[in-house]
Amino acid sequence: MAMAMVEGAEERGELRPGMKVVEYSGGSTGSSLAFVCAVKGYQCKIVSSDAFAQEKLDTMRAFGAELDVVPSDNGKITAELIKEMIRRTEILAMHDETFFTDQLNNGDIVRGFEKLGSEILLQLNKPIDAFCGSVGTAGMLMGVSKILRKSEYGTRIIALEPASSPFLSTGKKGAHRVEGIAVSYTHLR
């Protein structure tokens, strides 16, 4: 996913040598993006929060990311927290020579996860009744399901979300402590 976002931006000329990459993340995207940026020579700044595991914050830093850590309400992941992380990232993205990967609105993430769908089919090499995946940006579930649905297996796709924040299934927002999923609102442009 991170490599797909960076390489897609490079191919379109939106990201060039010397630029800084910015993103908001609870850890998985941020760690991956920091790693890809380190390999490719880009500076990386991640807006995250103390609601996410210290190990995730440490991993992003270890891969070279500079962090802006937003305080949470007692460690809870809420729509308001995610919106504040996005707001701060959008402000950072206003600076010259900065590229915002914008994971919730970046079509490259789906293409990045299509490779995972192809690998699942190749490795299992047998019918797949169902595929379950948690939803954060939804890129993983969309990319994998796109490939699985093209197969002759008729795979059922199931999105998973915390019981206390069933936004996709009921529209109900709620706080939870499941990192990396359930932002409790839609942020599509």
Residue ranges and their predicted role:
Residues 46-49, 158-162:
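Short internal beta-strands
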Residues 15-49, 128-140:
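A short, small-residue-rich loop immediately preceding and capping a beta-strand
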Residues 1-17:
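Positively charged, low-complexity intrinsically disordered leader regions
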Residues 105-106, 136-139, 161-166, 172:
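Glycine-rich beta-alpha junction loops
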Residues 186-187:
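Conserved small/polar residues in nucleotide/adenosyl-binding loops
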Residues 29-89, 168-182:
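Active-site-proximal loop->helix
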Residues 95-135:
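Active-site/ligand-binding-proximal alpha/beta "capping" segment
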